[in-house]
Amino acid sequence: MGIKHLYQVISENAPDAVKTGEIKNHFGRKVAIDASMSIYSFLIAVRSDGQQLMSDAGETTSHLMGMFYRTLRIVDNGIKPLYVFDGAPPKLKGGELAKRSARKREAHEAHEEAKETGTAEDMEKFSRRTVRVTREHNEECKKLLKLMGVPYIDAPTEAEAQCAVLARAGKVYAAASEDMDTLCFEAPILLRHLTFSEQRKEPIQEIHLDKALEGLGMDRKQFIDLCILLGCDYLEPIPKVGPNTALKLIREHGSLEKVVEAIESDPKKKYVIPDDWPYKEARELFFNPDVRKADDPQCDFKWESPDVEGLIQFLVTEKGFSEDRVRNGAARLAKNLKSAQQSRLEGFFKPVTKTEAEKASLKRKHDEKIEEQKKRKKEEAKAKKEAKARPRGAV
């Protein structure tokens, strides 16, 4: 799930933190990818007539189809992917996982009912909601990656947190995930939409944590407190607290402790904090997640030549894939993983350090830009209010 509305908050209040561009712009870069999130998206997206793809034996193959062809697209564009798999979820995440499981059970029942009485649209909608990534899906994807020569590692707990460790250490350029909570784990750069299909034509979003903090005017602790208030995987959100209110509360009070104190002492009881809301434990999980250090031997990885015959046996013989397509894919892998060895030009040059005067000038321009955006929003809100107050038919 990640952090609710965080992308909206960053793009509106720290626009300089977000860059969008084509996948080819990341040629020559190593990227750590949240595997479990990717597999989940493959199970939802890679379908035929609203149903997951199946082998002749009735086994789901959507995850393998997605992993094979989306990884090929990444490698075709000169990127060297490293996949990171989730380990056991933190205990605090249990409540959220239980809720998701209950929602999936309800969706499964609704899906069965839609089969009997509903439209094809209803069936597809409820079918997507029943999707969950199983241990078997993960193990089959690991087997496929090994045959492709693409490395993967297992995280002790959260894959996003391990991706962030590797990015901070410079072992990869960025962490790639659709989950915005990757930024809470201090990933310097987050890439989104990297494993999307080419048909979706979604640009790659590149979000820089330092610029997000600068634009929001927050330190990392305040940023994490904001994310907890927005709603994260560890805690349910406070009812009636949306993105604008969450941002206002953190800016006004500076920390979750003071926000909670203000809410509980409010005689009007405008907001009510859930009975079981251990925000300090959630904050600790973001600050000190269970991860392996970047220099741990289990975090070593390298790209190798694909095992062509192994791929044929697994994908073609066992799973019913097209042999021509698999052989073609293996050839592309072998060729493009070699070309991805070429360094980006930026690797040969050290960035020139800005003077204090230049930094002050950039900050002034940034502040002016933020003020201009706020002014424009106020004017737009005022215009909307006036338009609503105007009688119908009045000019």
Swiss-Prot record:
Listed InterPro entries: 5-3_exonuclease_C_sf, Flap_endonuc, HhH2, PIN-like_dom_sf, XPG-I_dom, XPG/Rad2, XPG_CS, XPG_DNA_repair_N
UniProt region (I-domain), positions on chain: 122-253
Nucleus recorded as keyword: yes
Region (Interaction with PCNA): 341-349
Biased segments, Basic and acidic residues type: 356-389
Gene Ontology CC entries for this record: mitochondrion; nucleolus; nucleoplasm
Location of this chain's protein in the cell: Nucleus, Nucleolus; Nucleus, Nucleoplasm; Mitochondrion
Binding site for Mg(2+) 1: D34, D86, E158, E160
Residues the entry annotates as binding Mg(2+) 2: D179, D181, D233
Region spans: Disordered: 99-126, 356-395
GO biological process: base-excision repair; DNA replication, removal of RNA primer
Record carries keyword Nuclease: yes
PTM annotation: Phosphorylated. Phosphorylation upon DNA damage induces relocalization to the nuclear plasma.
Similarity remark: Belongs to the XPG/RAD2 endonuclease family. FEN1 subfamily.
Protein name, UniProt field: Flap endonuclease 1
